[in-house]
Amino acid sequence: MKNCKEITGCDILVAVEPENLFYMTGFWGEAIGILDKDGKTTIIAPELEVGRAKEEGIDCKVIQSDRGMSSLSTLKKFLKGKVCTDCQNYLVMQSLKKLFPKMKNSIEPFNKSREVKDESEIKILKKASKIIDEMFGICQKKIKQGQKESELQSILMSYAVENEMFDTGYRSTLNPLIIAGGPNGAL
């Protein structure tokens, strides 16, 4: 995310999308992430998420805030300079624009920062690949005629959780594992 200034002309990145929040801070949950021009990260989280944000966030300051749109007023206290966000929600972006009329919207700094992998990312990718390969093996052994996809999914999700993978329900994650179509589909 060091290239933010070059890419967007901004000093500060604000992550509201869960994938980018996680990538920026190590925390996956309901929160806003801020990366300032000095490379310091801050998480603004509601009361129920603060403890986990402190536990899971990597080198982050954690600030408690109310949930939802109220968190934007807390955000306003921390932003000085040119700001860029990854916000993909139209209503939230409109609210952000009211508070920060010159705020830019771009996912490019987040995407660019992911292009070059560091040692810890490579280690995580290798572990995830190994677990997914094992899950394909489980499918081959456990799948049988007449079985519902939801039954197979529960076996796979149990294995994934045992191996410290997590199901968030967000796109780009483990859920849904299964297509869930046809007469024996999960739906």
How would you describe each model-predicted region?
Residues 1-137:
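A composition/biophysics-driven feature that prefers long, compositionally simple stretches
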Residues 35-36, 95-99, 142, 155, ...:
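Alpha-helical structural signal in soluble globular domains
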